[in-house]
Regions:
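Short S/T/G/P-rich N-terminal loop/turn motif that feeds into the first structured element of a domain
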Residues: 1-50, 58-65, 91-93
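C-terminal structural segments of small proteins and small subunits
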Residues: 57-82
């Protein structure tokens, strides 16, 4: 989950769109990455996180590879430039 730095709804929407574009581009590039989804909060309740990221990987080794992959690090650099807070949970289904 991320909180965005942008103040206006237009900037926030543009940042989310760019985040989505960069992250979905990782599918087929990062081995073991099955899917990646980025969704904005519905805005129904104040003080919620702005956006959530869910990624699915073949296994824990694929998750570790994803975290270290240069393409992921490049996408992460952009995400860090437009966010000011992050919460992460890794779990198995």
């Amino acid at each position: 989950m991320f909180n965005l730095t942008a103040a206006s709804d237009e900037e926030r929407a543009a940042d989310i769109s760019e985040m989505q574009s960069r992250l979905t581009a990782l599918i087929g590039v990062v081995p073991g990455l099955q899917s990646i989804t980025l969704k904005p909060d519905l805005g129904l309740v104040e003080d919620h996180w702005d956006v959530v990221l869910v990624s699915e990987h073949d296994d824990n080794a694929a998750l570790e590879g994803y975290q270290e992959h240069p393409a992921h690090k490049e996408a992460g650099a952009f995400i860090r430039s437009v966010t000011n807070d992050r919460a992460t949970v890794d779990y198995e289904l």
